[in-house]
Amino acid sequence: MQEKEMFDLTIIGGGPAGLYSTFYAGMRDLKVKLVEYNKELGGKILFYPEKIIWDVGGMPPTTGRTLINQLVEQATTFNPTICLNEHIVRMVREPDNTYTLFNEQGKAHYTRAVMLASGHGIPVMQKLEIEGADRYEVSNLHYTVTQMDIFANKRVLISGGGNAAVDWANELANISKEVVVCHRRDEFGGHEKNVEQMKSVTKIHTPYQIKELHGVGSAIEAVTLAHCDTGEQRQIEVDAVIVNHGMKLDGCFLIEAGLALEEDGFLRVSACMETSQPGIFAAGDVTRHEGKLQLISGAFVEGATAVNGVKQFLDPKADKQAYVSSHNEKFKKKNEQLKQEKQAQLMN
């Protein structure tokens, strides 16, 4: 029989909002659990680990992978419970006003409050809908770019027209032998200056889409493109194919939970980031509200605000927010450890 361990707060979603909220919940002395659908933490940033992020306050330009690593290290400061590879599909409010969360396998998580930090839902890359395409995924068919250097001196075809496709094309043009971009529309959805740059350093085929993959064994050697209006076909030789056709987002859990949504489908929240259900809070891309800041930094603020809301929901007499870390007793011992480590490094 499963032991019923109760947590103060269970956070669903391990992206920037969920990770920072996990850290801040530790500052608020909450017993916290973080549940993530994927096998590793990081959220949507996992799809673009080599993209450079400039807009996190106080940090120099850094890659998505580096930012994830730092957020994970920070999130584990107070030893939270972290569960990976778990898809929460049902939430039940119990008679004592606690919540029981169930994953796909029926495993239960018991909690006094919930924070939804799952973005627009579970992100799944849109795969190429061509028969037999999956057999090339082990070699040179890619749905994201995790290492730029594997495309060095290669002929690369990129299918897609959004920001990610445009950015990858510009980056790879610096190291690849040739970059070809195909898009089913004449216009690209990326930023105008980036699109102009892409057109100057790559070969563009519009409006074309991938019709057929040609390969030997598990590797693609050529691709047939078809004109979206006339059907005219052309074949190009390639060493690698990158497909970026957007993501499917599974957000049905929010609807089934009976939470109030805005007209655009995002969660409606109060000033303290509480949803329409008592004890259920939210932060990050899953929410919309007046003054919403669409930056990673905004997710941090919403996460901390939501945790403060949780703290007062559980204990109305609690302080409205935590003391800043520079004057917080919780960090006194940790600061001493850091000083000792720094002194030891200087002595060596």
Swiss-Prot record:
Pfam annotation, one family: Pyr_redox_2
Matches recorded under Gene3D superfamilies: FAD/NAD(P)-binding domain (3.50.50.60)
Ligand binding (FAD): E36, K44, Y48, I88, P123, D285, S326
UniProt enzyme class: oxidoreductase
Protein family membership: Belongs to the ferredoxin--NADP reductase type 2 family.
E.C. designation(s): 1.18.1.2
Catalyzed reactions per annotation: 2 reduced [2Fe-2S]-[ferredoxin] + NADP(+) + H(+) = 2 oxidized [2Fe-2S]-[ferredoxin] + NADPH
This protein's record includes keyword Oxidoreductase: yes
Keywords of this entry: FAD, Flavoprotein, NADP, Oxidoreductase
InterPro entries: FAD/NAD-bd_sf, FAD/NAD-binding_dom, Fd--NADP_Rdtase_type_2, Ferredoxin-NADP_redctase_2
Coiled coil: none
Co-factor binding details: Binds 1 FAD per subunit.
Region described as Disordered: spans on this chain: 329-348
Requisite cofactors: FAD
One annotated GO molecular function: NADP binding
Subunit structure: Homodimer.
Protein name: Ferredoxin--NADP reductase 1
